[in-house]
């Protein structure tokens, strides 16, 4: 099996809905992904931990590969 390229191991995540009124764990997941403001986009490593945070708050995010 060939090693994957580092550029392919990034996921683009954009916060499209506010965290106001959300449960504390979901706000923590958004912060853990490095998102602070609406429409802010970050690139995170494709790891199981980041995938779990993205799945938990997927209703707040737009995700691109």
Curated annotation (Swiss-Prot):
GO MF assignments: structural constituent of ribosome
This protein's UniProt keywords: Ribonucleoprotein, Ribosomal protein
Alphabetized InterPro entries for the sequence: Ribo_uL30_ferredoxin-like_sf (IPR036919), Ribosomal_uL30_bac-type (IPR005996), Ribosomal_uL30_ferredoxin-like (IPR016082)
UniProt keyword annotation of Calcium present: no
Signal peptide coordinates: none
Keyword Flavoprotein part of the UniProt annotation: no
CC terms in the record's Gene Ontology section: cytosolic large ribosomal subunit
One Pfam family named in its UniProt record: Ribosomal_L30
GO biological process, one term: translation
Entry's family note: Belongs to the universal ribosomal protein uL30 family.
Subunit structure: Part of the 50S ribosomal subunit.
Record's protein name: Large ribosomal subunit protein uL30
Species of origin: Methylobacillus flagellatus (strain ATCC 51484 / DSM 6875 / VKM B-1610 / KT)
Lineage of source species: Bacteria, Pseudomonadati, Pseudomonadota, Betaproteobacteria, Nitrosomonadales
